[in-house]
Amino acid sequence: SAAIGASYGGSIGLTTTSGPGMALKTEALGLAMMLEIPLVIVNIQRGGPSTGLPTKTEQSDLMQAYYGRNGEAPIPVIAASTPSDCFEMAFEAVRIAIEHMTPVILLSDGYIANGAEPWKYPTASELPKIEVHFKTSLDEGEEKFLPYKRNEKLARPWAIPGTPGLEHRIGGIEKQHETGNVSYDPENHEFMVKMRQAKVDKIADYIPLQTIDSGAANGKVLVLGWGSTYGTIKSAVLQLQSQGKSVSHTHIKYMRPFPKNLGEI
């Protein structure tokens, strides 16, 4: 709730947890999705269910990240593959959250969290710029603020509380298209459900295409992985390649939506 409040107030809210904590945050995640505000939730996965294996690693929360909210509540999901990759994917989670006005789930796990590797720390000038655009006034010809009027990315405006002329309703009850007024109309609800899904799907236009990590693009066998299995899979594939096997490896970082060319690979 504090992270949601930070995002509502114009900062980027970020919270970290593990599987059981994700279960407890389910209702709040649904609220953040309905509010359509930028937020990052990091799930450092461990063995489950319940208390499970709290000191052991497991990649068991992917379906929870996809569907672990009531109703139809799509949230983008990305995953780090190595300790150094955590920085890049955390940065990417913030970028997606801000530019697309949505909560983002970043998956890691105990293996990555307890791992280490050499890594060159990037300078600020080396990082891509994240564009932050706060709504500060009504646009020319705009008679009243429409908090759910969308841009080309289907993202709504980010209006800071207290900005004169931009007062609007906020909360978990379904909103009317564009006006943000409370609406129980079934046709509007269907429209908004599809709109929120379309917004997440459209993120695929703004993420990198999938690449082959090792091996030929036309190999006979493709090993597909995600998360902390990266090093293990790569080592196994390289060993098979040294034996003359036609094996390739690709590792997915963008779990929802997938890169647009993933099916072609």
Predicted feature descriptions by range:
Residues G52, A73, A80, S183, ...:
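A general structural-boundary detector
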Residues G71-P74, Q176-H177:
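A short small-residue
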Residues G68-G71, G215-A216:
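Short, flexible turn/loop "capping" segments at secondary-structure junctions
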Residues T16, E72, H249-I252:
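A generic, residue-level signal for flexible/boundary positions that often mark functional hotspots
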Residues S1-Y67, P76-A97, S242:
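Thiamine diphosphate
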Residues M89, V94-I265:
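Flexible, low-complexity linker and terminal segments
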